[in-house]
Amino acid sequence: YGKRRHPKKLTPLAYKQFIPNVAEKTLGASGRYEGKITRNSERFKELTPNYNPDIIFKDEENTVMNQWPGVKLRVTEGWDEDGHHFEESLHYEGRAVDITTSDRDKSKYGTLSRLAVEAGF
């Protein structure tokens, strides 16, 4: 009580590293697949759109901005219906997101992945 926590050192994730260390569609990573959501399904109404061009990632601590001033998070894919993912992809349920940085600097991706894990994704 009353003590300030020291920020822990962020270790970037390695290419193709998962947290937890299991594939996206396994029960341990994301729970049971509930079925594809289409525009005509009842569950489509449960999806929450985000139209804000500046705030596209809930980041109460401004971790992306603090890590790289002037750089924004860039969502390249969220909910999808195009059929370009594997059949039980969480993109079809609105439970997966692909992200990068606005400057598209691949050297930042490991740290960006770690920030996403720390944020609860």
Swiss-Prot record:
The keyword NAD does not apply. Zn(2+) binds at residues 91, 98. It holds the Pfam family HH_signal. SUPFAM superfamilies: Hedgehog/DD-peptidase. Signal peptide: none annotated. Ca(2+) 1 binds at residues 60-61, 76-77. InterPro entries: Hedgehog (IPR001657), Hedgehog_sig/DD-Pept_Zn-bd_sf (IPR009045), Hedgehog_Signaling (IPR050387), Hedgehog_signalling_dom (IPR000320). The keyword Membrane applies. It is found in: Secreted; Cell membrane. Transmembrane segments: none annotated. The C-terminal domain displays an autoproteolysis activity and a cholesterol transferase activity. Both activities result in the cleavage of the full-length protein and covalent attachment of a cholesterol moiety to the C-terminal of the newly generated N-terminal fragment (N-product). The N-product is the active species in both local and long-range signaling, whereas the C-product has no signaling activity. Cholesterylation is required for N-product targeting to lipid rafts and multimerization. Keywords: Autocatalytic cleavage, Calcium, Cell membrane, Developmental protein, Hydrolase, Lipoprotein, Membrane, Metal-binding, Palmitate, Protease, Secreted, Zinc. Ca(2+) 2 binds at residues 61, 77, 80, 82. The sonic hedgehog protein N-product binds calcium and zinc ions; this stabilizes the protein fold and is essential for protein-protein interactions mediated by this domain. N-product is active as a multimer. Belongs to the hedgehog family. This is Sonic hedgehog protein. The lineage of its organism: Eukaryota, Metazoa, Chordata, Craniata, Vertebrata.
